[in-house]
Amino acid sequence: MNERLQFVVVTGMSGAGKTVAMQSFEDLGFFCVDNMPPALLPKFWELIKENGKISKVALVVDLRSRGFYDQILGLLTGEEEQHNIKTDVVFLDATDEELVARYKETRRAHPLAMDGRVADGVRKERELLSPIKSEAQIVIDTTNMTPRELRSDIFGHFSTNKTIPKFHIEVVSFGYKYGSPIDADIIMDVRFLPNPYYVTELKNKIGTDPAVYDYVMNQPATEEFYTDYLKLLMDIMPGYQKEGKSNLTIAIGCTGGQHRSVAIAERLAKDLSKKYVTNISHRDAHKRKETVNRS
């Protein structure tokens, strides 16, 4: 391996936030594996070395088996003598009361008390994991944390300027006659704007055509709407970022997805790209299905 390998073992109490932690490491560019069977560890390690391009690995594991923990650290300790490796153990914890409350909320059984009280399972697990917690380089108490705060804590420990994920915006135009995008976070209906479809010379063109674009954007209704809508989006983007969202899809819809939505999406993507990483796509712009009615 040419560059230093960062290997993070994420473990801790059940219900303390290992799933959120794994998602956070994924956003930081780590190659993540959740609950790998111990028998596969040596083979996994060989594949990492052979690949040569993976520099960050996060292994999220259930370490109630002390033997697995010893196996992981034994393997890494031996490899550290031959390769440039940095190893960290992150232990996620919370108070017994908080863990019990989380299990009660999800109505799940504790893995160490499948037929008994959750509190008994938490107590048993804490006893088993106590030695591992004492050896962890990083212990995070998630008792009073929201998922966003846990994510922020992990970023604080492991992010660099190169690994902080950028906020990506996807602007997509669509036609309501084909259904709205299922992955849209924000949908704006622009069917209230004058429709170029009814202008003979514009009917068979799409919103990327300068003539159609100018027709849509130069309407008085468009100017007033667009100014307010862009300001609204710029005002709320920081909130999405603070909540830990790294990707946002904004969908702009009109009837057929060929004229108004395309033009507005083009302008919006251009303006948003001045501050954010922005991509644009026109889902239905080239669909030419005949329709009797167009509103």
Swiss-Prot record:
GO terms for molecular function: ATP binding; GTP binding. Keywords: ATP-binding, GTP-binding, Nucleotide-binding. It holds the Pfam family RapZ-like_N. The keyword Cell division does not apply. Disulfide bonds: none annotated. ATP binds at residues 12-19. GTP binds at residues 62-65. InterPro entries: P-loop_NTPase, RapZ-like, RapZ-like_N, RapZ_C. HAMAP family: RapZ_like. Belongs to the RapZ-like family. Displays ATPase and GTPase activities. This is Nucleotide-binding protein PEPE_0450. It comes from Pediococcus pentosaceus (strain ATCC 25745 / CCUG 21536 / LMG 10740 / 183-1w).
